[in-house]
Amino acid sequence: MIRPALRTDWTLEEARAIHALPFPELMHRAQTLHRAHFDPTAIETASLLSIKTGGCPEDCGYCSQSAHHDTGVKATKLMGTEEVLAAARRAKAAGAQRFCMGAAWRSPKDRDMDRLCDMVRGVADLGLETCMTLGMLSPGQVARLKAAGLDFYNHNIDTSPAYYARIASTRTMEDRLETVEQVRRGGIKVCCGGILGMGEAEEDRIALLVTLATLPAHPDSVPVNLWNEIEGVPVQGRAQAVDPFALVRIVALARILMPASVVRLSAGRTEMSDELQALCFLAGANSIFVGDQLLTTGNPAAWKDRDLLSRLGLHVAPARARPPVAAD
């Protein structure tokens, strides 16, 4: 199958028109492009661990880990390397191909970089792909993580540029985009997506994807999150459940605008029926988090995911070969 050239010049008008297509036509276009770039029966699996929880100085209105909100989440110190590696071994045994490590920071301190790099090297030595989400990074920190063997860096933009100011004030959309570009220029694969269900309009969801699809290069991985009900955060008062078909349309639009990117169903799968997840896979989603816990929210039990993939005739995608990491 011929793969159409990837575009980074999408317009909001084009995206609106695609999003509004009759459902069968939208699904057909998304599935056609999905098949051009991926095995449509293969699902990538990742596991996520909070290596430093709570006490974050940012005021993101959706987040239970912000120090600005009374959510009952207790701040912890950065975990030790051996504790992280033990969790990575469990994740691999449970079927994860990628191990993602998240810290609730505005940005990592230089004093923590040695330990973070040790974590990356240790996880890579287990044969897992490595991913981190640590907040904003300096060019020097990007270089150190790259040298340690970090495969992916997650830094979501959360929502549309127009709606962003209603979500956070301590970090701007421009800050987020600069971090994404910093990571890309440093040679680390970019994981960047957003969150649905925070009171945003349909237009904001479309604009979120257009923002990602018009970056200098598409993110390698695009996580699609549903906001989880969290007590004590500002978003709680205006959050609205996302219509199931609206979610599928967004997944399909992500696949069409960014056909070579992995599209991950991330937070919120506990609220999705098996039928909804199946439609999302048909629309082009091809990755999930496995394990009972994400950062501070739940996730479907491993047996449920195995059962769902089996019933759909899907399989876990084979792990990609990792390039050798140069010694320090």
UniProtKB/Swiss-Prot annotation:
Domain Radical SAM core: 41-260
GO term, biological process aspect, one: biotin biosynthetic process
Entry annotated with the keyword Metal-binding: yes
Cofactor(s) this protein cannot do without: [4Fe-4S] cluster; [2Fe-2S] cluster
Gene3D superfamilies the record matches: Aldolase class I
InterPro entries named among the record's database cross-references: Aldolase_TIM, BATS_dom, Biotin_synth/BioAB, Biotin_synthase, Elp3/MiaA/NifB-like_rSAM, rSAM
Alphabetical list of NCBIfam families matching this protein: bioB
Protein's recorded name: Biotin synthase
Species of origin: Cereibacter sphaeroides (strain ATCC 17023 / DSM 158 / JCM 6121 / CCUG 31486 / LMG 2827 / NBRC 12203 / NCIMB 8253 / ATH 2.4.1.)
Lineage: Bacteria, Pseudomonadati, Pseudomonadota, Alphaproteobacteria, Rhodobacterales
